[in-house]
From Swiss-Prot:
Chain segments carrying region Disordered: 1-24
Membrane-crossing segments per the record: 130-150, 167-187, 223-243, 266-285, 325-345, 351-371, 437-457
A Gene Ontology molecular function term of the record: ligand-gated monoatomic ion channel activity
GO biological process: detection of carbon dioxide; detection of chemical stimulus involved in sensory perception of taste; determination of adult lifespan; monoatomic ion transmembrane transport; response to carbon dioxide; sensory perception of smell; sensory perception of taste; signal transduction
Keyword flag Glycoprotein: yes
Subcellular localization: Cell membrane
Domain of life, per lineage: Eukaryota
Protein name: Gustatory and odorant receptor 63a
Amino acid sequence: MRPSGEKVVKGHGQGNSGHSLSGMANYYRRKKGDAVFLNAKPLNSANAQAYLYGVRKYSIGLAERLDADYEAPPLDRKKSSDSTASNNPEFKPSVFYRNIDPINWFLRIIGVLPIVRHGPARAKFEMNSASFIYSVVFFVLLACYVGYVANNRIHIVRSLSGPFEEAVIAYLFLVNILPIMIIPILWYEARKIAKLFNDWDDFEVLYYQISGHSLPLKLRQKAVYIAIVLPILSVLSVVITHVTMSDLNINQVVPYCILDNLTAMLGAWWFLICEAMSITAHLLAERFQKALKHIGPAAMVADYRVLWLRLSKLTRDTGNALCYTFVFMSLYLFFIITLSIYGLMSQLSEGFGIKDIGLTITALWNIGLLFYICDEAHYASVNVRTNFQKKLLMVELNWMNSDAQTEINMFLRATEMNPSTINCGGFFDVNRTLFKGLLTTMVTYLVVLLQFQISIPTDKGDSEGANNITVVDFVMDSLDNDMSLMGASTLSTTTVGTTLPPPIMKLKGRKG
């Protein structure tokens, strides 16, 4: 067994020599189609162990083992082409899925994510599965419950006769019911989400084949904490809001708690997915920089280019898989934040009251959720593309052969040609610019609404009914005032036109 290991080490040393470097580079050169684009699959999703037996001879994982007196397996041993990757004790399958599984588990409880998964790379959406049937039953029951609550809220809105800001608070409770529409949207996107999970499993196998170790994501503990703490905070915020802004009715608080937990956990789910991409991109950049210290054939650079292309595709697929869900989420959060801040600012003129506590909590909670959605997506995009480009630009090409330099240049070109932004199906890029744009638009609407609020007492003057004006009354009074002004203007014009001729005639009479 020792001579075989010595033979491998010797071959590795010969690969570093200038005499046979170009020959080995040509020998290990890949087909252009396999090394260039995104359809790179693992050699076999059930064949990660074959990596150790000559599949990727010059990747950094094997180089480190050789430096650490690693004894390679005997050359006459048969390659385990049909063995599974999970049989290798060093390979840990489904790392990504296991890290976000606590959030998936919570979402499945509230009937949101009916995806069946029978093993690594075997996630799918089935309409005849028990998970989907449970999701449909849960949605129907929740829809009936929400319909009952919405009917009561509509009656409250119709019976309002107070100031306009009180109507805004009533509308706020009505808008809080809208997240129930997210559940059927996620049914529509469940197949794309299942494909995203499968692509992550394939990426993990490819990462193991190239780097020599499993993907070291360590997000499960954070996911467990989020799955426990976030629902508690969400329920507390809903209860405090109902206590301070309306009469507390337990029967009507329950659906609000479920829907608020739905939006909060979807935000946490998005946060963990983007965090996993950021950590993976950082690890890949560090491994690639370390791999460049080992002089080897140019195929090693091509391996990492293929791996980066797969990660870049995962970044884009994340936005496409959750396209309509997060478009709806962004619009919903924008609407809720605008209404809550307007209600808060319109009542501050009378002093900070108990209703302002609920409005403040609602505004801060949803602003924080929107910020984390945009910020984590921005951070993931920067790590996948910008930071990786910095690593490539810092590579010293002087000591590399021409083939390796060509591969580095192709790598840089690939990072420029393949965008790594998280785009929601072409609607918008999810990044900090989106958050800034929504806030700017929000300020514009708030200025208009506050001007509308300030103009109410000026139109009614000092009349006794000024404090009980409704929105409809204000609009009708504004129209009456406009019509009165137009009538007065027309009358004055007619009077001037009819009274001007007599003075002229009198002047002519005097001259005569």
